[in-house]
Swiss-Prot record:
Keywords: Mitochondrion, Ribonucleoprotein, Ribosomal protein, Transit peptide. This is Small ribosomal subunit protein uS10m. The lineage of its organism: Eukaryota, Fungi, Dikarya, Ascomycota, Taphrinomycotina. One of its GO terms (biological process) is mitochondrial translation. Component of the mitochondrial ribosome (mitoribosome), a dedicated translation machinery responsible for the synthesis of mitochondrial genome-encoded proteins, including at least some of the essential transmembrane subunits of the mitochondrial respiratory chain. The mitoribosomes are attached to the mitochondrial inner membrane and translation products are cotranslationally integrated into the membrane. It comes from Schizosaccharomyces pombe (strain 972 / ATCC 24843) (Fission yeast). Residues 1-17 form a transit peptide. One of its GO terms (molecular function) is structural constituent of ribosome. Gene3D superfamilies: Ribosomal protein S10 domain. One of its GO terms (cellular component) is mitochondrial small ribosomal subunit. Its main location: mitochondrion.
Length: 228
């Protein structure tokens, strides 16, 4: 199923899929977009149903927008992959999230060579191949709460044979970054002290001596041993 943007399209020959209800094709001078809007069946559709036949509308990020997250969608089948990327773009539009994409990424090709059979055909081999298709969508200037809601909704509506891989980016001031760095350095120093400190045996002996010193019987034994 083809999708069309609201903008201008090059003039092409009419196709059968956009025939009118009578069965006659529209004039050759009209573009496919004009043929679609002139179709009486398309004109009777509700706006939410008619939007399925068009490309999803997107909020394009400006130069001042900051990259907040990137989303990769992977699948072994391109039809379901394209369908779900279309759904993601529409979801981002209704949540007012500026996005870039979907951009196709290089395919990952995996191949295996195995024995055809352990008995009769063990001398012959058979090749197996698996191709992973992926798309990339980048999200800009999103509130963290909105981004979390967006990802949770996609997880809820995800198809069973698709894999979603998301990366979120957080930006902070230099002062906050220095404070976090100092706190992390202190925690590492404490960890090093624990590693370089006394062993478990030494700790046990120290605690045992503390307990014995408070015991009156042990004190009497120490006094008697010192007198001798």
């Amino acid at each position: 199923m083809k999708r069309y943007m609201f903008g201008t399209l090059p003039r092409v020959q009419p196709k059968r899929c956009f025939q009118t209800a009578i069965g006659k094709e529209s004039p050759k001078g009209n573009s496919e977009k004009d043929q679609l809007f002139e179709n009486p069946f398309f004109q009777q559709l509700p706006s939410n149903v008619a939007a399925v036949y068009l490309n999803p509308v997107k909020f394009n990020p400006s130069e001042n927008d900051v990259l907040c997250a990137s989303l990769k969608i992977k699948s072994f089948e391109t039809p379901k992959l394209d369908t779900f990327t279309d759904f993601i773009c529409r979801t981002a539009y209704y949540m007012k999230i500026p996005i870039k994409g979907p951009r196709p990424l290089p395919n990952k090709v995996e191949s295996w060579t195995l024995l055809r059979s352990p008995f009769i055909h063990k001398s012959s081999q058979e090749n197996f191949e698996r191709i992973t298709h992926s798309r990339l969508i980048q999200l800009y200037s999103v509130n963290p709460v909105t981004l979390e809601t967006f990802f949770s909704y996609l997880r809820k509506c995800n198809m069973w044979d698709l894999k979603l891989q998301a990366k979120a980016y957080e930006y902070e001031s230099i002062d906050d970054a220095l404070k976090n760095f100092e706190s992390q350095s202190k925690s590492t120093d404490n960890f090093k002290e624990l590693l370089n400190g006394p062993s478990k045996k030494d700790i046990i002996t120290q605690n045992a001596e503390k307990l014995l010193r408070n015991d009156p019987i042990y004190k009497d034994l120490l006094k008697n041993s010192s007198r001798k």
